[in-house]
Amino acid sequence: ADAHEVLGELGVHFEAAANEAGAAAMLGASINYPLRGAATWKSVVGTNVASDALSNLSSAGVVGGAMIVIGEDYGEGASIIQERSHSFAQKSQIWLLDPRPNLPSIVRMVEKGFELSEASNTPVMLELRIRACHVHGSFETKDNVAPKHSRRNPIQKPVFNLERIPLPPHNYTQEKLKIDVRLPEALKFIQREQLNEFFAGDLRQIGIILQGGMYNTTIRALQQFGLADPYGESRIPLYVLNVTY
C-alpha cells in the first residue's frame, strides 16, 4: 500500500485480502487472461486455508503467470505447526521454487518464476524459508515494466472457455494436460534457463544434491568439517535445486 503511487503509474492493482482463500481466488484472473498475479501468505496454515482455490487454479492451469509467495515457517526458529508446503505442490502439481538464501538468487527466481508459470501454464510457489527471510545483502535492480493489460489498458473482450472449468468432462482433460504438456514444458524451461545450480568442488568421489533453501545450512555444516569456507566455496560438488518440484 505504501507503494501506491508507483503501482498506480504501472497500472498494478494491490488488494489486502481478508484471508488466504480470498488472496488465492484473486489469482483466478490468470486462468483465462494474460494477466500476471501474485499472492502471499505465511505457510503452512495459510496454504491450508487457500487449498480449495489453489486446487482449482492448478487444475485449470493459467495463461498469465501466477505466483504464490509463501513464508515457509518450518524448522529452527519456527513459530507454528511443523508441516511443509512441499506436499501441497506435489498434490496439486504446482511448481515449487526454493531459492538459495541469497538476494540476487531470490530476485532472479521471482522473475523466472513468472516466466516458468507462463511457459508451462502452471501456477508456481516461491517459498522463502526462515533463513531466506532474514538474509542480508544487495542486488542490482532492473527497470519497471508495465503490464500489457491493466486498469490503464483493459482487455476489451471477456473470455469464456468451458474447457477451463474444473468439472467433468474437462477436469479429466486438465489432469492429462498436467503430465503430457505442462510438465515437459516446465522441464524444458528449467533446463534452458539453468534455474538449478551446480557448484564444482575438488573432491569428485561424492556430491550432494540439496534443495536451494538448504544451501546456507549445508555450507555451514561442511565448514565444521573443513570442507567449505565462510564464502560458500565447497570442496564437495553441490547440485542446488532452486526448483525443488
Map each language-model feature to its residues.
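Thiamine diphosphate
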Residues: A1-P104, R131, Q194, A200-Q205, ...
